[in-house]
């Protein structure tokens, strides 16, 4: 009897879940969402190059819109389908399910008046890639993975930490368009962000398959498209919310100002061409930099380059030996940069052997340097944690010892979120414990599945875009706001900074 009742309950629950497909909740209706597929008809759609819905190649069955298989060729069966309406600012949400080896796409800003091609092909538009990365050869074409699932096809790859589900399971794609700002989301996680029409966007187009198409991706409005690529792909819960343009000057509900970035994030390009890299950083919407290197320049030269671009340096990072042996030079460089803080991020020690003697020496040196910097130059000294300090010591950790024995008048702290989390400490707990001792923060995320330790090191590919890793960044920022953090800096040590930093910045703006 129990099994029978359980089975009936399961069936009822399944029926209830299925009944919610292709419907809007009361909350969604209130927010302005509209269905683009009712689960029964193809109302609201037509062929990309014909004035009616295709007679073949597409099927509505069991509440699903399906691309019928036809050998994997592009638009040779029914062809693509597009909406009857143009859109500009919007949030689009689509559930899709891939079959093995399948390829499709969700396109936006599609010009409905584009010429009909002489040979079958997909209609032109910006494409959210829908692909079986493991089995379809297109995943290995293009550049740096820019043809993999959720990428902006042939232009920008999605972050490597994207949460794609297994073939045969339902994924949710979301595209957000606000003016020229566009975001791709996969299963509730932002995986890509870019600015249509920016110099960076135009440069990518110039190196892509779209290079000979004038004005590609620059239309003010356009249709939405589901692609027929000759493989079986299912769609459901296709819905859109038209939005009003929001100027991209907001920092988010939690952050009062748009965060900055650590120069180490762009260390390689800054070393090669400092001014061009500053231009790129500003184009991303970042104007506050913590410099941890002068990159072969004089501090005054960097300040001049920053001033010319309306940018600033609020913190200057230097090495431990320099605060001991070159404190005057450090202070003068910080002042020349316009910084208010001087930061040290590493206490020299033998690998795997951080001792109380080392901690005591650091406390002595930090107190001395902090006193000089404050009293002689009006600068605030900060120590930046790196993981090894959280090894147990007496009833706490070496970090607790450093906190307890440094003079709060002269020594403050910069929290590196990843290097708190990596050795197993909750950043929120630490912020609550030491509150106002923190003045600066490096905002970073750690790839899911990575188990940390006290080494103070991890592979650079374990730095992932904010919101895609293990750390509850929203909770950290909320706690940090209460502690009085003055400057937040995005730091990303990976090789994918040009992909990940825009995602991280957009993520923070959503908080």
Regions found by a protein language model. Name each.
Residues 1-22:
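Bacterial Sec-dependent N-terminal signal peptides
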Residues 246-341:
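N-terminal pre-domain/capping segments
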Residues 266-272, 288-300, 318-326, 350-353, ...:
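Acidic-and-aromatic substrate-binding clefts and catalytic sites of carbohydrate-active enzymes
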Residues 288, 320-413, 498:
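Active-site acidic/histidine proton-transfer and metal-coordination neighborhood
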